Amino acid sequence: MLQMGKIFLGLAFWNVVLFVATIWLGIAHRSAHWQHQAMGVLTGIYTLLTHSIVLMHFMGSGKGIKDAVETHGLPADYARRTRRFKARTSGLATLSCLLIIAVVWLGGAKDVGMLKGMTHAWLAYFVVAFNLYSFWVEYRVIKENTEMIREIDARIANKS
C-alpha cells in the first residue's frame, strides 16, 4: 500500500520520454510527418491520463482520510490538510490537461493549414514546461499526503 509516489514517478518518467520523442519528431523532420502527429496525440492522451490519475488519487485518499477521521475520532486537521493537498494539485492538473488539449488541437490546425508559423511549437514548449512544473508540484504533494496517511495509520494502530 501507499505506492502512489512510485506509480506517479513511473507515469511522469514515461510522460517525459513521450514529450522528448514528440518534440524530436517535430523538430528533426527526419520522420514522416504522420509520426509526429501520432506521437503528439499519444503524448496528449498519456498526459491526460497521468493528471487524471493524480486527481483520482486525491479524491480517493481524501474520502478515506475523512472516513478515518470520523470513524476513529482523529483531529479534524487531517481532513483540512487533505483538502489543502487537493487544492494545491487540482488546479494545476486541470490546467495542464486543458493546455495539452489546446496544443494537440493547434497541431491539428497547423496540419490542415489553419495555423501558420511557430505558434504550435512555441505553445508546445510552454505546455511541456508547465507540465514538468505540475509534475514536480504533484509529486511533492503526493509525498506529503503519503506521510500524512502513514501518520493516520500509526495513530489508528496505537489506539487499537
Language-model regions, residue ranges each:
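Short membrane-interface loop/juxtamembrane segments of multi-pass integral membrane proteins
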Residues: K66-L92, I152-S160
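Membrane-interfacial helix-loop-helix connectors in multipass membrane proteins
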Residues: A28-Q35, A109-A121
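Loop-to-transmembrane boundary segments
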Residues: L2-G10, Y78-A102
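Alpha-helical transmembrane segments of integral membrane proteins, especially early/N-terminal helices
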Residues: M1-G26, S96, D153-K159
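Hydrophobic alpha-helical membrane-embedded segments
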Residues: V16-V20, W34-S61, A129-E138
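Alpha-helical transmembrane segments and their membrane-interface junctions
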Residues: L18-L25, L92-K116
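Inner-leaflet juxtamembrane helices
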Residues: S52-T71, F135-D153
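Alpha-helical transmembrane segments and their immediate juxtamembrane interface regions
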Residues: L2-G5, G113-N158
